[in-house]
Amino acid sequence: MPIHLECMSHTPLHGYFDPAPEVVAEVERVQRVARERVDAFDPELVIVFAPDHYNGFFYDVMPQFCIGVRATAIGDFNSAAGPLPVARDVALALADAALASDIDVAVSYRMQVDHGCAQALDVLTGGIDRYPVVPVFINSVAPPMASCRRARLLGDAIGRAAARMNRRVLLIGSGGMSHEPPVPEIAAADDVVAERLIAGRNPSPESRNARQSRTIAAAKAFAAGDSRLHPLNPAWDRALLELLERGEIAAADGLTNEAITRDAGKSAHEIRTWVAAFGALAASGPYAASIDYYRAIPEWIAGFGAMHAHEQTLSRR
């Protein structure tokens, strides 16, 4: 059965601190066209590769990869909230497939996903509960982190399993590109912040609002040029987009953690979600890909990109 891919940056700042109206309109147009492709494809299963921002995964036990068997969206930054319609048997089968390929993936029967997962589902499918879904968490912010090569191999294992299913499968990669929002690091954290990074589940509304306010303030400073956050790197972003467009997914193995942080910022590690999604698609053979959008958007502290792809045996959608 056919497999279709959509990869897109996400931002929690949309609606809180926006760029010029014409830029917002550009992004929303790209999102609308992507949604139309998904509607036309009419998936029977959605596999979404997504990061987390210390909302669902913490240092009490920080897996590199985790497949949700049951999952709930927490609704941070006014993103969609509520239970996800997880295809449980499929989730467990994908976990078995990953383990059989020597990818040590965890499973969760109480996964909490934040805007990094929920926004992609909402934008691309019209909600978080429209299609059966399997959420796949990829650690992209909490060192030590697995390599891009391991993310690709995770995608490959999941893609080979998905290709054997008699279903139309939509692959989503949510995250990236170059960006470095104000995410704390446990190595330099005081005791209070460290405890939040270790065991910060289900914070009070006041605590969550304070965190969101800090992010908005950081975005305003970044857009004004008054910030120590890592600058956006459009050249790096475009090089990655073009690599994926050419079908050279294995070349992503050469992206080291140190180089990603140095060149694109500490949260650019979210491109692992794209690498995993393209790895899953490439498991079925050569693919045809299109770069749909790219713009560096300082107000969202993000290099904002979008791509779609499908197997070469299918007509281009």
Swiss-Prot record:
Q: Which GO terms describe its biological process?
A: 3-phenylpropionate catabolic process
Principal EC category: oxidoreductase
E.C. code: 1.13.11.16
- Output the InterPro entries linked to this UniProt entry: DHPP/DHXA_dioxygenase (IPR023789), Xdiol_dOase_suB (IPR004183)
One MF term in the entry's GO annotations: ferrous iron binding
Q: Does the keyword ATP-binding apply?
A: no
Respond yes or no to whether keyword Iron is given for this record: yes
The active site annotation covers 115, 179
Q: Which cofactor does it need?
A: Fe(2+)
Q: What catalytic activity does the UniProt entry give for this protein?
A: 3-(2,3-dihydroxyphenyl)propanoate + O2 = (2Z,4E)-2-hydroxy-6-oxonona-2,4-dienedioate + H(+); (2E)-3-(2,3-dihydroxyphenyl)prop-2-enoate + O2 = (2Z,4E,7E)-2-hydroxy-6-oxonona-2,4,7-trienedioate + H(+)
Which keywords describe this protein according to UniProt? Aromatic hydrocarbons catabolism, Dioxygenase, Iron, Oxidoreductase
Q: In which pathway does it act?
A: Aromatic compound metabolism; 3-phenylpropanoate degradation
Q: Which family does it belong to?
A: Belongs to the LigB/MhpB extradiol dioxygenase family.
The entry's function note states:
Catalyzes the non-heme iron(II)-dependent oxidative cleavage of 2,3-dihydroxyphenylpropionic acid and 2,3-dihydroxicinnamic acid into 2-hydroxy-6-ketononadienedioate and 2-hydroxy-6-ketononatrienedioate, respectively.
Describe the protein's quaternary organization and the partners it interacts with.
Homotetramer.
Could you tell me what this protein is called?
Answer: 2,3-dihydroxyphenylpropionate/2,3-dihydroxicinnamic acid 1,2-dioxygenase
This chain's source organism reads Paraburkholderia phymatum (strain DSM 17167 / CIP 108236 / LMG 21445 / STM815) (Burkholderia phymatum)
